[in-house]
Amino acid sequence: MSSRSIVSGVLVVLLLAGSAWAHHNMSAYFDFNNRVTITGTLAKIDWRNPHIELIVDTKNGEKVQPFRLEGPAPGFFRDRDVSRADFDGALGKAVTAEASRARDGSDWGLLRTMMLPSGKLVSACPQNC
């Protein structure tokens, strides 16, 4: 194998590792010290890898304002006895969520907990939130 091939291979690995680290460094996108409580209607569930996404329609006066919540992968929830059916049962109903707000101040947050209409408290944190 030529030294050029080895150097090229090493560079590719280093570039991919940097991209993977940046993607999984949630503190780059979310301010863990800026917690918000969102109350509204669960409008959408995107249950897929690598992260689930929920849309909660909140009220801003008379205007409906969607708030996007990003959570861990579906497998994270399955390991904690939470299924998509738990979220499906909440579609169109009132929920309350706690999230770490996006650093850019947009209506986007990293899901910490969500209280479902069934009374089930769902935690999206690997340890205590």
Residue ranges of model-derived segments:
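Short nucleic-acid-contacting surface segments enriched for D/E, G, S/T with interspersed K/R
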Residues: D79-A97
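Short boundary/loop segments of OB/S1/cold-shock single-stranded nucleic-acid-binding domains
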Residues: A20-V36
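Conserved hydrophobic positions within beta-strands
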Residues: G40-L42
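OB-fold/S1-family single-stranded nucleic acid-binding modules
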Residues: S100-Q127
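Bacterial N-terminal signal peptides
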Residues: S8-S19
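A short macromolecule-binding patch
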Residues: G61-A73
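Short, structured beta-strand/loop micro-motifs enriched in basic residues and often containing a Trp
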Residues: P72-R80
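Short aromatic-glycine-enriched beta-strand elements
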Residues: R48-K59
